């Protein structure tokens, strides 16, 4: 009964607030206490009992009352942090205020007139004490709120265990507390593993929800190419003003990386016991990636209003980014810490892949997108971590889940963002030689995927999945084709033995991309052919010995190369090719690609359910903006190429002058030529046809085709295995052109990808927070909410 009464009283207070036309004095504690003092409302109750329309009504009609509600709620949190929340009543007040602010803040952010409200100073309202500390009291409300949340996240007996049992109830005790002794979980920089405590986890989660809501002001600003628009909430929270920055960063990272959803591995245990840890881990992962939203391409220090200022620190060489969370992340260096992080992320990413004999017997986590963003941030901000990942085969424990997600999401339009981040991570990894070398490890783990069965290496898995994405993904994935093929180009010089299945897939892609209707239907389509020819050239020149399957496939499909060499350039042929083009082509025909049987236990990639919510994404830069070319020297080191030599040495990627927007738009096969905006000319075809890198392949065909034909005639052979045996023992030493230098296209950070990551990350957070629906139905500007 008590609970029902408290909900009723709370609802009455809300109605009073919305109906009062006169401002309620901040000193009227009897009125304001109704919102937090005597209620035991859950966060779900608060969302149900405080409707969006009523918050907006108060904001428009009695703004001073909404302002006072926020002041008073923050004041209560500050008092709780100062006093240490010793009584149950104090703890309840803190939780109630936290829930109320989580509900109200998005409606403050959505109104531009209110946006500066939390950054204004409130005399006397910033701190609980009535002392002479005018400077303290003049803190902006946002700063008081953020510091209170930080203090409360390390509050003994509320969010952490009390190490001292002598009950010193003094405020000094709270301020002298060394929160580094209270890190939530063992791992990086902390060896002690505290006893799990359900209540503490729940309280942490509520406070992290509020913190995430504070940070979410970014959702209410439209995407802008200037990534200088720093989030003032994140900037202050991750500054030296927050004395808990280091222990909180460590707590969040360790909580995520130490989590094991399977636990003791007892089947169905997740059905018997609720896992209270997972919601905390999700919240920790989301807060962590938002605090790390720092553009590594810029180094200016923005102020609260977004303008950049020079400081005395700028002249000196700064120790690292001003964002302490980014700084701490970039300075992790111990091997055991890297091992802990990598194992933790790999374990969680692999969790949805766990297949047992008992369906649904293991708990499946849902926050793999947040984990991929976290992994990206780790590799981007800490190059030592990236090299550690690539130093051993452990990188394959990240690769396989990413390929699983890419394959699974390829038909689902609501998961385009997941496809992009998976491909971006692989592009980043492929810029390092070690990644290509690691791919030669045999692939023996059989993750059920909707792809043809093959026996081979992780390189085979990568190429077979990429082929599946290109030939049977939905149309919105076409801008990714360049990235997918760039990854294959980057690793190709190191691939020792591709399987026959994979060799056929690569040749099928070349066959599809080199049809005249495809080549002539958009101004950039020929780049895909250049990429594939570069793959073949790299393998022939640098890994010929082990790749008899690919050489055999090239010989069998030699007509494709001859057609390319003799591509028609006269206007009637161009017209005829475009006429032949089907009216609404699929992304690519799958005819000619032997699909074979799919893996046992796999299910086809399914499109999104109609009505599924998704968030829009800003466009990604073209491959020319995403990467820079480097040449591999003889000693294996990389040398960055000057733009001019890039231009001449490889015509197979768009020139810097070409806008990436046109690059994306023109790739739309369905309407490229129909739109009439662009049509191919003889001069245009001649401009790139002469640069097709066919010399190596033509020389190979010139030498090997007569030999293979002779063997077949002499021995009456029709058996592939005999021909393959001949090719395995053959050599082209001295017969091929001089090997070309290996070109690697390394990912480079830029403001375009920084903005893409920001919109993607907040879109994921928006859609994942449905209980309670913190931002649902508010006027977000960073992205659009769409239904599939």
UniProtKB/Swiss-Prot annotation:
<feature type="region of interest" description="Disordered">
    <location>
        <begin position="571"/>
        <end position="680"/>
    </location>
</feature>
<dbReference type="GO" id="GO:0005881">
    <property type="term" value="C:cytoplasmic microtubule"/>
</dbReference>
<feature type="compositionally biased region" description="Polar residues">
    <location>
        <begin position="590"/>
        <end position="600"/>
    </location>
</feature>
<feature type="compositionally biased region" description="Polar residues">
    <location>
        <begin position="643"/>
        <end position="680"/>
    </location>
</feature>
<dbReference type="Pfam" id="PF12722">
    <property type="entry name" value="Hid1"/>
</dbReference>
<protein>
    <recommendedName>
        <fullName>Protein HID1</fullName>
    </recommendedName>
</protein>
<dbReference type="GO" id="GO:0042144">
    <property type="term" value="P:vacuole fusion, non-autophagic"/>
</dbReference>
<keyword id="KW-0449">Lipoprotein</keyword>
<keyword id="KW-0333">Golgi apparatus</keyword>
<feature type="lipid moiety-binding region" description="N-myristoyl glycine">
    <location>
        <position position="2"/>
    </location>
</feature>
<dbReference type="GO" id="GO:0005737">
    <property type="term" value="C:cytoplasm"/>
</dbReference>
<keyword id="KW-0597">Phosphoprotein</keyword>
<dbReference type="GO" id="GO:0005797">
    <property type="term" value="C:Golgi medial cisterna"/>
</dbReference>
<feature type="modified residue" description="Phosphoserine">
    <location>
        <position position="653"/>
    </location>
</feature>
<dbReference type="InterPro" id="IPR026705">
    <property type="entry name" value="Hid-1/Ecm30"/>
</dbReference>
<dbReference type="GO" id="GO:0030070">
    <property type="term" value="P:insulin processing"/>
</dbReference>
<keyword id="KW-0472">Membrane</keyword>
<feature type="modified residue" description="Phosphoserine">
    <location>
        <position position="670"/>
    </location>
</feature>
<dbReference type="GO" id="GO:0098548">
    <property type="term" value="C:cytoplasmic side of Golgi membrane"/>
</dbReference>
<feature type="compositionally biased region" description="Low complexity">
    <location>
        <begin position="297"/>
        <end position="313"/>
    </location>
</feature>
<feature type="region of interest" description="Disordered">
    <location>
        <begin position="297"/>
        <end position="316"/>
    </location>
</feature>
<dbReference type="GO" id="GO:0005829">
    <property type="term" value="C:cytosol"/>
</dbReference>
<comment type="similarity">
    <text>Belongs to the hid-1 family.</text>
</comment>
<keyword id="KW-0519">Myristate</keyword>
<dbReference type="GO" id="GO:0061792">
    <property type="term" value="P:secretory granule maturation"/>
</dbReference>
<dbReference type="GO" id="GO:0000138">
    <property type="term" value="C:Golgi trans cisterna"/>
</dbReference>
<dbReference type="GO" id="GO:0009749">
    <property type="term" value="P:response to glucose"/>
</dbReference>
<keyword id="KW-0963">Cytoplasm</keyword>
